[in-house]
Amino acid sequence: MLATPTIESPEEAARRAKESTLLSPRFYTTDYAAMNAIDVSSIRAEWDAMLAEYEGDNNHDHFQRTPEFPQEVAERFSQVSPELRQEFLDFLVSSVTSEFSGCVLYNEIQKNVENPDVKALMRYMARDESRHAGFINQALRDFGLGIDLGGLKRTKAYTYFKPKYIFYATYLSEKIGYARYITIYRQLERHPDKRFHPIFRWFERWCNDEFRHGESFALILRAHPHLITGPNLLWVRFFLLAVYATMYVRDHMRPLLHEAMGLESTDYDYRVFQITNEISKQVFPISLDIDHPAFRAGMERLVHVKTKVDAAKARGGLVGRLQQAAWAAAGAATFARMYLIPVRRHALPAQVRMAPAW
């Protein structure tokens, strides 16, 4: 595997955050008029209960660093290898970019709609994501690598997504984020000696924010049944596979991070897939067959393709560009074959909302 370019300066951290690749977090814009037309009257009771939870703000005091935090960073992190240091810094940069992406999107929606239900929801979620991004950015500042988030908002490229794509992608991003964080938290509670940075101690209550955000999009999707039936199921299937594949490939580019926690990247990812499959039954009538041999082989093939694309990019020149194109086509073909693997089908529950019980 090729070495990841090192993050040693704020400029490199900012450059990494600004990247627009298949695997990097993106910034989004959408159709605000369509967002304004969202109607949640069919799930009013569950919606109002959820907004009351946001208003209660049970995490208002959670994202505060303890006085011991910097000392623990100095003591624990001084023991990690340079390679692990780089993978962890890459994780922080990717995470702060992802959290801030949500903050920017939700804030822009709430500024551009009049619908009181949507406006209130987006304001609450932007508040949460702002806290998350700020907390991670402070962890980067401990290494002298803080990112100018205002500058990132102005300079990073934006991708236009229709509202339904926002709903699918963001629902899955929030729920898979919950599954990732809670799996790491539980592992490190069992093995505190492997907690090489204090930020992981915040993950339990943190991931409950992610879970609640996902609940919000679950309610929106269930309030608009046409988004999860008929031809739109093809889009559901696409986003399920795209989100899972992106996570799998990205995680296998930084295996030392999981190894340091006592996890193995493949086992960890399939545990996260399993949790996300169970959760997403609240809103999607289909789920990916993650145990199908062709699914697992396809994921491994995508990792192999990524390493080949990176090698071709490093080679450069005409030959390198031709190799990149060939391997990119191989990746697209692999994704297409995985898309055709039969999915599992199930009935939707009468009650949409669920508790974070993992």
Curated annotation (Swiss-Prot):
One of the record's GO molecular function terms: magnesium-protoporphyrin IX monomethyl ester (oxidative) cyclase activity
Pathway note: Porphyrin-containing compound metabolism; chlorophyll biosynthesis
Catalytic activity: Mg-protoporphyrin IX 13-monomethyl ester + 3 NADPH + 3 O2 + 2 H(+) = 3,8-divinyl protochlorophyllide a + 3 NADP(+) + 5 H2O
UniProt-listed Enzyme Commission number(s): 1.14.13.81
InterPro entries according to UniProt: AcsF, Ferritin-like_SF, Rr_diiron-bd_dom
GO-annotated biological processes: light-independent bacteriochlorophyll biosynthetic process; photosynthesis
Highest taxon of the lineage: Bacteria
Keywords: Bacteriochlorophyll biosynthesis, Chlorophyll biosynthesis, Iron, Metal-binding, NADP, Oxidoreductase, Photosynthesis
Signal peptide: none
Record bears the keyword Nucleotidyltransferase: no
Cofactor names: Fe cation
Keyword Metal-binding appears in the UniProt entry: yes
Family, per entry: Belongs to the AcsF family.
Reported function: Catalyzes the formation of the isocyclic ring in chlorophyll biosynthesis in aerobic conditions. Mediates the cyclase reaction, which results in the formation of divinylprotochlorophyllide (Pchlide) characteristic of all chlorophylls from magnesium-protoporphyrin IX 13-monomethyl ester (MgPMME).
Identification of the protein by name: Aerobic magnesium-protoporphyrin IX monomethyl ester [oxidative] cyclase
Lineage: Bacteria, Pseudomonadati, Pseudomonadota, Betaproteobacteria, Burkholderiales
